Structure formats: structure tokens, C-alpha cells
Amino acid sequence: MSRRNISKKRFPEADSTYNSYLVSLLITRILKSGKKNLAQNIVNAAFEIIKVKTNEDPLVVFERAIRNASPVVEVKARRIGGSTYQVPVEVSGFRATNLSLRWIIQYSRQRVGRTMSIKLANEIIDTANDIGNTIKKKEETHKMQMPIKHLHIFVINY
């Protein structure tokens, strides 16, 4: 048995502009090559675009988008009796938030547009309105577990 100390999970501090933990998670997900200032500028510009387009508080729209994109169930590979099955597993709250952030950023990068802030703003607005590629990804994840619901009994060790 390992004698190493278990490292504590570290969370980023709340964002200074919006005082939100979710916004700081978004900034760290957008971050590339340590350029945090650029990532903050992208997120702030995206939130300004959201404010102009929707006439709502961008933080409320962003939180609604995260809630809409968060999956409830995902499938994991589980080896049972010599064969591998895709077993449906419930997703914890933190993992669901991380997955939704990852999907929003992934599909905003794939969008056609001039700047990342415009693409990110459009993806957040679409996700908040229950349309777009992020919602399709969530529904696809839920559909993957539909034909194999009977395998939920093998989830004991997860």
C-alpha cells in the first residue's frame, strides 16, 4: 500500500471581475501556453457580447448554459468476464460542470467566426437556449447509455 500523502484537490480562486468560481474555471480551460491575461480578455469580451445580444446578465446566461450542458450519466468501459462492456455511471456535480465547460470550449473553437470571444459568446448563448453542438453532445452521451441500462448492476466498484 502506498505511503504517499494524498494531494488535496485545489480549486482556482473566484474571478475578480464577476466574483464567480465558474468564470475562473472557464478562464483556466481557455488558457493556452500560460497566457492567462489573454484568456481573461477573451472571456470578458465574450461576456460583453452576451450582454449586448441577450440584454441579460452574462453570468446568469453562462450559468444557465452550464446547467443545460451538464450530463447526468456517462458510460465507462468495464471489463467483466473476459469482455468489455460500456457501463452507465452517474456523473458527479464537479465532473458534470467540467465536462460541460470542456464541451462548450471545444465546440466554440470549432465554430466559424472572427475571434474566439465571438465564437465563445455564440456557443454560450446557444447552449443557454438548449440548441447547438454542446447540447447535441450531451444528448449523444445520454443516448449511448440507453441500450445498455441493464448493465448498471456492474457499477458497484466505480
Curated annotation (Swiss-Prot):
UniProt cross-references to NCBIfam families, sorted A to Z: rpsG_bact
PROSITE patterns: RIBOSOMAL_S7 (PS00052)
The keyword Ribosomal protein is annotated on this UniProt entry: yes
UniProt lineage: Eukaryota, Sar, Stramenopiles, Ochrophyta, Bacillariophyta
CDD domains, per the entry: uS7_Chloroplast
Subunit details: Part of the 30S ribosomal subunit.
Primary localization class, coarse: plastid
GO cellular component terms attached to this protein's record: chloroplast; small ribosomal subunit
Entry keyword Cell membrane: no
GO terms for biological process, alphabetical: translation
Location relative to the cell: Plastid, Chloroplast
Gene (UniProt): rps7
UniProt protein name: Small ribosomal subunit protein uS7c
Single GO MF descriptor: structural constituent of ribosome
Sequence intervals crossing the membrane: none
Highest rank taxon of the organism: Eukaryota
Protein function: One of the primary rRNA binding proteins, it binds directly to 16S rRNA where it nucleates assembly of the head domain of the 30S subunit.
Record family assignment: Belongs to the universal ribosomal protein uS7 family.
